[in-house]
Every structure is written in structure tokens, then in C-alpha cells.
Amino acid sequence: MTGVRVAGVGLTHFGRHPERTGRDLFAEAALAAREESAVPPDDIEAVNYGNFMGALSERQGHQAPLMAEMAGLQCPATRYEDACASAGVAIREAVKAVRSGEADVVLAGGCERMTNLSTAAVTEGLATAADELYEIRAGMTFPGAYALMARAYFEQFGGSREDLAHVAVKNHDNALPNEYAQFHRAITVDEVLEAPMVSDPVGLLDACPVTDGASAIVLVSDEYAEAN
């Protein structure tokens, strides 16, 4: 097996982009990754695209070939759907393809466009990643699921809402120097604790936001990198 190197990365700003389509967002990230990598488009042998909500938020199935086309590529393109891990799985499979020698160059990444939907529609859409028979029919939402997990953790290991609040504070602090982050505002533990409750003990500032954005990465084999 060969080693795998990162040749280029690209990101969009994450936030509300109601005027843009998912394929437009992914094209921005993919073109940025291509530019940083300096890999000729004809050398890219596959596009691995991760997406969960596209069929719901944009009524668009069979997305991967459209994403490849928008990125200026003509090669096999595959969509990976694994809920919140969709783009991560797309990248993992790209690494496996390069390591195994199946390909020398793969562009991988993902995109979600969600802010064109109402909060209720996004919540319902995200809930489809849960078990339809035993969770969705019982009214389970993902904030509710994580609230149950947090309560179980507190019961077994100890902990409190204040401990969770420090995680939110840390996350906002990490976003401050990141130009692509959705929020650029420091928050305090008190603000987290005083925010509206979503599903006890998960409050508004504990929960992940709805957002639009895309990212992409160009992976190459050691042999390709050394030859180019």
C-alpha cells in the first residue's frame, strides 16, 4: 500500500446562504482545493461526495455527478450518506482508494444546505437519520436523543449542565480565529446556562446550529506527489 498525502483543501464560509445552491457551495470548496493542490483536473480520478439533506432540502437526488460537473471534473463520482458522518465517510473511502492503489488522486468532501428550510422542516429531516420504527414514531428528535445521552452520562459518571456549558464556550472560542466559522462571538458559561432550553439538559447554545457550507480535500498517493 502507498502513503496518502493532502495536496489541497478548500472551504466555504459556513452560515446562511439562501441565494446559493448546494452544488454552487461545493463547487467553491472543490475549486479552492484544486487550486491549492495544483493538480490538473484530468488527473483527478474520482469525486467522493458526502451529503445527508440534499434530497430533502433541495429535492435533488443523484447529486455526485452534478457536483463533479460543477467542479469542472469529468470522472466517476459517488455520493456517500451516513448522517453527520457523510463527508467523513467520503474522505475515508478516498483514503482507502488511494492507499490500495485504485486511484492516485481523489477529490473528496461534502456539503449541506439547510437554511432554506424552516426549523420544523430541518428538525423533521434530521430526524430521518434516527430509527423510524422505534425512535421517530415515538417522537424522538436529535436534541432529545443527545439530552437522554447526557442524562445517562451524568447519572453514571457525574456532571452537570455547567460542565456542558464549558464545551459550548470552548467551541465558540475556537471559532473566533476561523474566518470560515458561522459564529464569531465569545460566550460565557452564564449565557449558555441562561439560553432557552431545547431538551433538558441541552440548551440552545449547546445544540448545533442549522447552516449552509461545504468543504473539499484533494488526496494523492506518495508516488503521484513525488512525480509531480
Predicted regions, residues:
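Condensing-enzyme catalytic core mediating Claisen C-C bond formation in acyl metabolism
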Residues: 1-23, 32, 132, 166, ...
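Active-site-proximal alpha-helical scaffold in enzymes
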Residues: 81-112, 143-177, 217-223
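Conserved active-site "lid/cap" helical segment
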Residues: 1-85, 93, 153-160, 182-188, ...
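Conserved catalytic cysteine-centered active-site region
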Residues: 17, 54-105, 113-145, 183-209
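Short, mixed-charge, low-aromatic patches
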Residues: 19-26, 45-54, 105-110, 122-126, ...
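Internal metal/ion-chelating core segments
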Residues: 151-211
